[in-house]
Amino acid sequence: MRNQALLNDGGTPLYSLYEIAGFTDGTMPGHDWYDTFMNDAASMQRYNVNISGGNNRVKYLVNAGYLHQNSLIDAEKNDNYNPALKLHRFNILANVDVTLHRYLNCFLNTNVTIDRINQGYNGTGDIMNSIYQMAPTVPGPITEDGKVITAEYNEYPTYGLINRSGYSHQTGINLNVAYGMNLDLGFLTKGLSVKGIVGYEANYDGTIYGSTDYARYAANGSGLFGTHTTLPLSLSKTANMRYFINFQGFINYNRIFGGKHEVDAFVSYFNENMMKNGDLPYDRLSLMGHVKYGYDSRYYIQGDFTYDGTEQFKPGNRFKFFPTVSAA
């Protein structure tokens, strides 16, 4: 059927009459390459520790976690490197809330995640594509003395993609910190409060690549296939880092008068700065406002606006005003 499909598309048949006869009488290999290169299941381990407590003035929460996950792809470790896909993830979360005064409280939230990912040099998509391209009649995947076998139509056999092409080792670090204070101004007028938050986020992504090539041997036993030769590992490294700093300020007012008149309003200010190695900085400013009036929990009218801008646009056209009004 595969031969016929190729012929219908104007291609060349994949299997010769000799291979078809050999596959029928059992003299030709009949590999299930998916079963050869894929595991039935992949293990995953997850551990978490939580600590929380406090009193009327101070409350805290600490969570530490570890995750280890293996891959469904069946890779083989060699003397120089391990191409098996493995994920190690560590994360720590720490939150503290402090009541400084009857009207004033603050918080500090911190979250750190570290990922370490080891895998082969080639991606999962390339490997899966190779598995489905390999004909079941191809012997191997390696000879008794460890030589990689391939077919004429497949320059990159699955075994070589997984085990003989190299590796990559990636480290990712993500840090998030937020500090905020909330002041209840109810002593001035009921329902009025102000809030400020300073946030910081930093991301690091670094990868070490070890790439190599390997000799291929023809499935028909004629010797070397193509011009590929076995090469020593070639190492390279990439690293990227970026950070965000933002400030948010809010003035909130929420109050009900006479049991039927509801007023909800706020004004907020947002400022964000981003830096990334090799790129120009990015700045954004936003001023937002919202006011809503409700009567008897049935009729509402609401107005909102955003005054938003960034230095990414040309001078004189960096800020825009976006108003909206609705009623129900």
Language model features with spans:
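Surface-exposed loop/turn segments flanking beta-strands in extracellular/periplasmic regions
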Residues: 2-28, 126-157, 208-235, 262-265, ...
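Flexible loop and strand-edge segments within Gram-negative outer membrane beta-barrel domains
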Residues: 25-65, 69-72, 83-157, 166-174, ...
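Extracellular loop and loop/strand-boundary signature of outer-membrane beta-barrel proteins
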Residues: 34-37, 78-82, 95, 162-168, ...
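Structural signature of outer-membrane beta-barrel channels/translocons
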Residues: 52-56, 65, 97-99, 103-105, ...
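Membrane-embedded beta-strand positions of outer-membrane beta-barrel proteins
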Residues: 62, 108, 179, 194-196, ...
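Short secondary-structure subsegments characteristic of cysteine-rich extracellular domains
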Residues: 77-97, 197-199, 318, 322-326
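Structural signature of Gram-negative outer-membrane beta-barrels, strongest in the C-terminal barrel
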Residues: 99-101, 235-248, 254-328
